[in-house]
Amino acid sequence: MKRILYIIIGMVACLSAKAQTVDSLTICQLLSESRQQPSTACLPLFFAQKFIGRPYVAHTLEGNATERLVVNTRQLDCTTLVETVTALTLCAQNRKYAYADYKRALTGLRYRGGKIDGYPSRIHYFTEWIIDNTRSGVVTEVQSPNPPFTAVQTVKVNYMSQHPQSYQALREHPEYVAEISKIERQVSGAQFRYIPKKLVGNKKLLRGAVRDGDIIAITCNKAGLDIAHLGFAVWKRDGLHLLNASQIHKKVVSEPMTLYRYLKKHPSHTGIRIIRINK
């Protein structure tokens, strides 16, 4: 029986090692390809488009006994796509092409202050992600001109502490809930200007405010949440589109419909916040 258990453990470790090898090769290949891009290239879109077709899989950061950095380029959700592409962009801009450089960049984006110290140290609300990464100098939230940034979001987050049963780590470690609740209180009350849904269809206004490769954070009116979905801005002939890891399409796609039409199909979506990766 012990022998069988050891074999199973060995197989799992082997599969994990193979996955890590695939991920590291993917990252190094993409960073190598980025060296050939002209200085005028939109690096966030260059990298994001490389992931089109990758399967949408949620919760890929969960399930580890001890919190650690997870690199998974094979399966993405809306948040991990944004983090993966942003980390690649930062590396390419700084001419850092090693896998270790990428892991440092990803750690800095995903964990508060760039330090891994248990599950609560991971940034779980995108508003805090913006605040933390603005503080570290890697992104800037665009909140002007007005119009189109005519609306103000007053953040009120408590979804995780109010629904701990929805999160594996909180079910297994109820002591984390108090820490998460403290973070929620710190983030709540902050105000940010955003573009309301009704103005997202105004191409003339948006052209002056949103650029290719900007991170789009879709605001919502769902109780306890700040952001419903994430993706990257892509301008096409008919208007602004969203490149995202789509739960609906079950893969990474550049949405065929305009972002305005996309938002209209989701009554709880109220508008968009715009975050730009610093150069």
Give names to the regions the model predicted.
Residues 194-206, 220:
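Short alpha-helix capping/helix-loop boundary micro-motifs
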Residues 211-279:
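C-terminal soluble interaction/assembly domains
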Residues 56-193, 235, 239, 244-247:
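Acidic/His-rich structured neighborhood in mature extracellular/periplasmic domains
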Residues 31, 40-55, 61:
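Sequence/structural signature of beta-propeller domains
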Residues 34, 38, 68-75, 221:
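Short, charged/polar micro-motifs that form catalytic or ligand-binding hotspots
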Residues 1-24:
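Bacterial Sec-dependent N-terminal signal peptides
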Residues 10, 188-191, 208:
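Sequence termini and other peripheral, non-core segments
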